[in-house]
Amino acid sequence: QPKQFINFGNWTLFGKTLERIKNSIFDYPIVSTNKKYISEIKKHLKLKGFKKYRIILEPAKRNTAPAILSSTLIKEIPENQPLIFLTSDHLIEKTNLFNKSIKQHQKYLTDKNIFIFGIKPSNPSSEFGYFLSKRVNNKYKVSKFIEKPNLEKAKKIVKKNAYWNSGMFFLTKKSIINNFKKHQNRIFNHCLNSVNKSKFKNNIYNLNKNNFLKCKTISFDYAILEKSKDINAINLNIPWSDLGSWK
């Protein structure tokens, strides 16, 4: 069973993620997954009181770039809509600070830029990727990404005020479209065709298999973040655990 659905007494990681968006600043959740977990996801959504939601069913694993793009391209989302992408296996405390930071940064969103959430390291760790950022005009501009370093390098970059890359993103639909068209146009076309030919029923989009399978398997970090010149950071000092890295 995936970690996000394991019951820790009376809670699960996916349940905690849904609780995080039970706030008036958010609209409705869109969950990207595959057929295997659909009943578990619907059970959680019902339990947390979500009447409106969308589930995007991927016919195959293609990593986070196609998953993010295909869940964005559904027609009901307006192009200027701000979107926040959350992983389902993270544990975040002080959600009031997390939500406050989203509200504070929304005014800076454009049709090209991307905000990533950085977490102040509680200790040097080789389990996570890092980034360096510098303050430019009221926001933090990402200057460098560092792949999961060894422990010695992690100690050095933490002293340079590096933040953990949490894998959570905040941007507009238009920005996603523009970035994929510019940096990953083939993935964009295959995902668009897959969404346009999808079947929609009972809150669920079944993506078109033939088109989706043509998408390259690649993470959003490699596909877009490493190529875009307009990456900004929302740097947070809150308790955070990526239990996806828990063995």
Q: Where are the language model's segments positioned?
A:
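N-terminal nucleotide-binding beta1-loop-alpha1 segment
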Residues: 1
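Residue-level signal for inorganic ion chemistry
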Residues: 5, 14, 71, 89, ...
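Conserved beta-strand scaffold positions in the cores of enzyme catalytic domains, especially
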Residues: 5, 55-56, 114-116, 231-233
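A short acidic, often aromatic-flanked loop/helix-cap motif at beta-alpha or helix-coil junctions
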Residues: 61-65, 122-125, 151-152, 240-242
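Conserved donor-nucleotide/metal-binding helix-loop-beta segment in metal-dependent transferases, i.e.
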Residues: 91-125
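Catalytic core of tubulin tyrosine ligase-like
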Residues: 130-247
